[in-house]
Design a protein with these regions (language model features):
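Zn2+-dependent cytidine deaminase-like catalytic core
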Residues: 16-120, 204, 279-281
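Active-site ligand-binding patch in enzyme domains
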Residues: 130-267, 275-278
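Short, basic/aromatic recognition patches
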Residues: 1-7, 131
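Amphipathic coiled-coil/heptad-repeat helices and related helical stalk/stem segments
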Residues: 37, 70-74, 98, 162-165, ...
Length: 282
């Protein structure tokens, strides 16, 4: 449920159980706001179950945090409420957590079980885990093609998608932090790259414009939302546009992925044409 709203934080859900009955549920809803464990505990308290905590088990998809960030440590909150046992789906690879939450709970005398449904929990947060373990964003390549395997025409827009598939693509966009196209797609399609057909936040718009030849009138440069332009001419920021300078003597894909890591962008949807898609595959 937190997809598209909590990045760069992971999506996390928590359930509090007392004698086989759920007494509280919660999930991380918005970046910078209360984590899943907090919402779960607050719901249980609101429902009058605070006295049951010392005999309760919390099930949480990711290791509770142990550091002060946008919010206080969830491990401290669990300890404060004397919850008896915590069952964790997967360990948090973020360097400020990475086992510290588990250690803190255990030192407080709380029983901790890890690795329950770990595969499913890793899949849930594949963007987060890719970013922190492989040190690059999670990349999704998207294209539409005709029955005879064509994805476009030279310098002209080819309409393949229908109303249903367009809404599906906008749903996908709402789940990723950034969306990337190349110069040819920007000129031929003049896309907005928003989520106007689906609820949720629009991703950061990325475009490769090596010579800075794209006209400012293109929809991708609309003032609503952030834009990053990868180019060989300049570095800097103008209004809502970040210009990120790259070179032509090394892989543009690697430079883009390194830049996105620098910007703390954990996922990118590549919606470009054949040239851009092939560069990622190669």
């Amino acid at each position: 449920q937190g997809a598209g709203y909590v990045a760069p934080n992971p999506m996390v859900g928590a359930v509090l159980v007392h004698q086989g009955k759920i007494i509280g549920e919660g999930y991380h809803q918005v970046y910078g706001k209360a984590h899943a464990e907090v919402n779960c505990i607050e719901q249980a308290i609101a429902n009058g179950h605070a006295g049951k905590f010392p005999e309760s088990v919390m099930y949480v998809t990711l290791e509770p945090c142990a550091h002060f960030g946008k919010t206080p440590p969830c491990a401290d909150l669990i300890i404060h409420h004397r919850i008896a046992e915590v069952v964790i789906g997967s360990r948090d690879p973020f360097k400020q957590v990475d086992g510290k939450g588990i250690e803190k709970l255990q030192k407080a005398g709380i029983k901790v079980i890890t690795g329950v449904l770990e595969k499913e929990c890793l899949e849930l947060n594949k963007r987060f885990f890719t970013f922190h373990t492989l040190h690059r964003p999670y990349v999704i390549l998207k294209w539409a093609q005709t029955a005879d395997a064509r994805i476009g025409t030279i310098n002209r827009r080819l309409l393949i998608s229908n109303e249903y598939s367009n809404r599906l693509v906008h749903k996908w966009r709402s789940e990723e932090q950034a969306i990337l196209i190349g110069t040819n797609t920007a000129l031929a399609d003049n896309p907005e790259l928003t989520t106007r057909l689906w609820p949720g936040q629009s991703p950061i718009r990325l475009v490769i414009d090596m010579e800075l030849k794209l006209p400012a009138s293109l929809k991708i440069f609309a003032p609503e939302g952030r834009v990053i332009v990868f180019n060989t001419r300049k570095q800097g920021k103008e209004n809502n546009i970040d210009y990120y300078q790259v070179t032509e003597d090394t892989s543009i894909v690697h430079q883009i992925l390194n830049a996105l890591r620098h910007f703390n962008i954990q996922s990118v949807l590549a919606e470009g044409g054949a040239q851009l898609l092939q560069s990622f595959i190669d």
